[in-house]
Every structure is written in structure tokens, then in C-alpha cells.
Amino acid sequence: MSEKNTIQFNFSYYALNLLGKQMYTNRWSAISELVANGLDAGATNVKLYINSINKKKSILEIIDNGSGMSYNDLATKYALIGRNKRLSENELSDKIKGRKGIGKLATLFLSKKYYIVSKKAGVTTAWMLDSTDKNDNDVPELI
């Protein structure tokens, strides 16, 4: 075989939901993980807004002043499940609170649909993951 082909792994909604649900014992531990992600991004200010007046459509917003994510950051860092932030030379490895690179899955413990709004270098971008009507075998996409 003279030609070398590579195959990248994909994760189905089932796998991501399973990981998200199995990692946390309650919603507060999942929220704590998401706050830690902001702190890992250098945030010095993190605010939580919770609107649970309508229990079926509760809203949780976590707003921080961390470094933010560009489209490239989202594609190469956020979407990579299990990324070790400590190996990146551009990040403050001694202050990193995350341990396994899968804390972003805490969102799936909390909801089947979530939004990411981020600002980096003056550019605001937004993405959404919605697994509400997806089959277990579908591959997730942030849109």
C-alpha cells in the first residue's frame, strides 16, 4: 500500500450525550464545570443568569470576560473532545482548572440545545448545537 489514507474519528449524538450525562451527578456540578472553562480562558469575571420561571424552557447564561473563541478556535479546540489544554504553549498551563478536556459536554447534561456567543479580537461570533430532533447515530454539528 503506497498511499497512506487517514480516517478521523467522529462522535455521534449518542456518545456525546452519554458522556455528558455520565460525567455529572447534578446540574450544579455541570454549571461549575462551565464556569471553570471560562476561568481557564483567563476570565476574571464570570456571571450566571438563571431564568427558571418556565421549568420546561429554563434559561442559563454564563457570561465571562475570558479570551473568547474565533471560528478557528471552535473548529480546532472546542470541537476536539479530550483536548489537553496543558500541552498548548499559548495557554497558562499552571492556572488551568479543567482536567480531561471534556468539560464542554456539561452543556449536554443541562440541555439538548445550547448556544455559544464569543468575542475575540473584536469579532463576535455565535454557534448553536441542537440535538432535540436528532437521531442517536447523527454526527453533531455546530451551526
What does each model-found stretch correspond to?
Residues 1-143:
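GHKL (Bergerat-fold) ATPase N-terminal catalytic module, capturing the glycine-rich phosphate-binding loop
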